């Protein structure tokens, strides 16, 4: 489920290295906005928090030179924020990609050993790195509770048999939960690079 608004924002300012005393806070179209110097935080009603730094004008999230250290800094920030509040969920490194001079690092949620697909993008936290600093990030705050196995998903053996009947035997099955912002996650079996089974 979703994590609530202003209480969430207040609790996360310290973890995000924002001083409560020096912030200008206002609300626009249901989104809470905090400006601090050249940095902006926006928290929408769905529990999505977006940070933007004015390019080259912020020093809030400076990073070490080594790539592995940069990724570790992103992991630590994700763990201190969305990872600390996700209930029974856990974070994992989902993807690292290079887009020109920009590095994008994404972390996803996992619940009871299965990946959680959050919205259409899928990630729990995304960090954009440019010139040894984080210039933008998106944090999707969710709180998950593991439930006993339910009969809502086709048992693994039956899902494998269905794949074989479709001529796709030998492909690896993965259980994925879809989080569309509702109270419950939707489970489904997926094959690598394919749709649901």
Q: What kind of region is each of these model predictions?
A:
Residues 26-35, 82-87, 108-120, 162-170:
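Short, solvent-exposed secondary-structure boundary motifs
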């Amino acid at each position: 489920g979703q994590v609530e608004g202003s209480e969430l924002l207040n609790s996360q300012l310290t973890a995000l290295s924002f001083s409560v005393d020096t912030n200008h806070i206002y609300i626009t179209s249901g989104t809470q906005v905090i400006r601090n110097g050249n940095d902006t935080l926006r928290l929408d009603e769905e529990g999505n928090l977006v940070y933007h730094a004015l390019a080259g004008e912020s020093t809030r999230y400076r990073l070490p030179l080594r790539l592995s250290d940069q990724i570790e800094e992103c992991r630590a920030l994700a763990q201190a924020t969305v990872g600390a509040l996700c209930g029974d969920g856990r974070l994992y490194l989902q993807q690292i990609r290079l887009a020109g001079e920009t590095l994008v690092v994404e972390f996803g949620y996992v619940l009871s050993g299965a990946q959680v697909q959050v919205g259409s993008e899928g990630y729990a936290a995304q960090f954009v790195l440019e010139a040894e600093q984080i210039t933008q990030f998106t944090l999707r705050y969710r709180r998950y509770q593991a439930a006993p196995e339910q009969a809502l998903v086709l048992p693994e053996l039956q899902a494998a048999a269905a794949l074989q009947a479709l001529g796709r035997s030998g492909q690896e099955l993965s259980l994925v939960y879809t989080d569309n912002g509702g109270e419950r996650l939707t489970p489904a079996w997926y094959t690598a690079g394919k749709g649901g089974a």
